[in-house]
Amino acid sequence: MKKLTKSFFFILFFLFLNFVSADEINRGLEIALKADNSFSGYGDSKTNLKMLLKDRKGSITERVMKMNLLEVPEDGDKSLIVFESPRDVRGVAVLSHAHKTGSDEQWLYLPALKRVKRVASKNRTGPFLGSEFSLEDLSFQEVEKYSYEYLREEVLEEKECDVIKRIPLDPYSGYTKQIVWVSKMDPLIYQIHHYDRKSFHFKTQIFRGYTKYLNKFWRPNEIHMINH
């Protein structure tokens, strides 16, 4: 009878743990969807961007680019990034077709070679043009491409945030997981910790200066990617 009681207790305890886990997963997904909705609905947009690369000695290199975005709700958003300066990267272009399921598609145009190169899914993880951003970072982060788990509540720079974990479903992703801080008030993403294939926290992405355009669409004025 004691063995039966212990076994029954263990089963109930196991079911309780699974129930909590499922609840946290659903809550994490719900928060991710709210953050995605705050970005969605724009249709298409054009943006002028400036990238500042800072090395360990403090020297700064400036790059100027343009980005065109096209929203495709039934599949995944598309983007075209074209570098305008400095001279050594002028004309370099990245075309990204994100997909809600399956691998994203990316093409790289190199003016020196005068040809377009399709980027293999497993080759999108390294630093792009000497920056801390990878080609994977430059593609849209569709909600469906991750599994989620709610972790905790936490204050980040005086903002009350929900902290969630998302795990890429793409087997070729350069990340094993990402820890994401989403403001409770907005809800907007303010920070992401990126973990590499060895589960080491090697990059932190920070979003600052959110501005609302057309009284509807929130966009950060600055995105910092810090390599640890």
Q: Could you say what each language-model-derived stretch is?
A:
Residues 8-18:
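Bacterial N-terminal signal peptides
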Residues 27-112:
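N-terminal mature ectodomain segment of secretory-pathway/periplasmic proteins
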Residues 33, 84, 95-97, 105-109, ...:
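Gly/Pro-enriched, hydrophobic low-complexity segments
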Residues 68-70, 149-155, 208-210:
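Short amphipathic beta-strand and strand-loop transition segments with alternating hydrophobic
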Residues 75, 157-160:
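Short acidic/glycine-enriched loop/turn segments that link adjacent beta-strands
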Residues 140-147, 153:
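Surface-exposed beta-loop interaction hotspot
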